[in-house]
Amino acid sequence: MSGHSKWHNIQGRKNAQDAKRGKVFQKISRELYMAVKAGGPDPDSNAQLRLVMDKAKAANMPKDNIKRAVDKGSGSGAENYEEVTYEGYGPGGIAVLVHALTDNKNRTAAAVRSAFTHHGGALAATGAVSYMFDRKGYIVISREDLDTDEDTMLMDVLDAGGDDLQSSDEAFEIYTDPKQLAAVRDALEANGYKLETAELTMIPENLTDVPADKVEKLQHMIDELEDNDDVSEVYEAANYPD
């Protein structure tokens, strides 16, 4: 995991994501719905629901929208979303993992396949690239106005049950066992830290350098995938040139 900064990629696309806020709310609503269906509507006893609710609040999703999604998940509505994972290679041979929540797998598969092929990539068989990624809990703490050095932060992370810490001038990035994410988050917050994000994610074990002439194509492919209403997350094992 050394040298890989998920936060750098997040910040690089932040403005574009802000412009898609309506789509972000729609996707979070589906995640809330699925979390409630799986574990009930009480965030105190449903750790996944609490994580998604925190994600919704961080995205400035209105409370009414959150409540509607939770209420819908608590009922017996007609929606029947399924979690689906697609694997493939983007331009330059970059491994890409796509997670989706869909009520129509045929529609979603066709759209994802089109995004790959349209930009010079290709879908692959199940298992082709998923082994290249590890499921991790991921927490970010901004260093702006934070008077804590890296050694102190590392001790606090380990005491909280975290596995690894990466630091940059802008932020501390913390990685955890996925099952311990909620506990680590709670411990850090109890210690007075303000978290920018706390989520489950997929971290590539190794990054592949993106050829300069493929950067734009790969980014356009990722954008098209993220624009799809059914797609919840896109992960790429990409090392972009400076």
Swiss-Prot record:
Keywords: Cytoplasm, DNA-binding, Transcription, Transcription regulation. InterPro entries: Integrase-like_N (IPR017856), TACO1_YebC-like_2nd/3rd_dom (IPR048300), TACO1_YebC_N (IPR049083), Transcrip_reg_TACO1-like (IPR002876), Transcrip_reg_TACO1-like_dom3 (IPR026564), YebC-like (IPR029072). GO terms for cellular component: cytosol. The keyword Protein transport does not apply. The keyword Transcription regulation applies. Disulfide bonds: none annotated. It is found in: Cytoplasm. Gene3D superfamilies: 1.10.10.200, 3.30.70.980. Residues 1-21 are annotated as: Disordered. Pfam families: TACO1_YebC_N, Transcrip_reg. GO terms for biological process: regulation of DNA-templated transcription. GO terms for molecular function: DNA binding. Belongs to the TACO1 family. PANTHER family: TRANSCRIPTIONAL REGULATORY PROTEIN YEBC-RELATED (PTHR12532:SF6), TRANSLATIONAL ACTIVATOR OF CYTOCHROME C OXIDASE 1 (PTHR12532). This is Probable transcriptional regulatory protein lp_2253. It comes from Lactiplantibacillus plantarum (strain ATCC BAA-793 / NCIMB 8826 / WCFS1) (Lactobacillus plantarum).
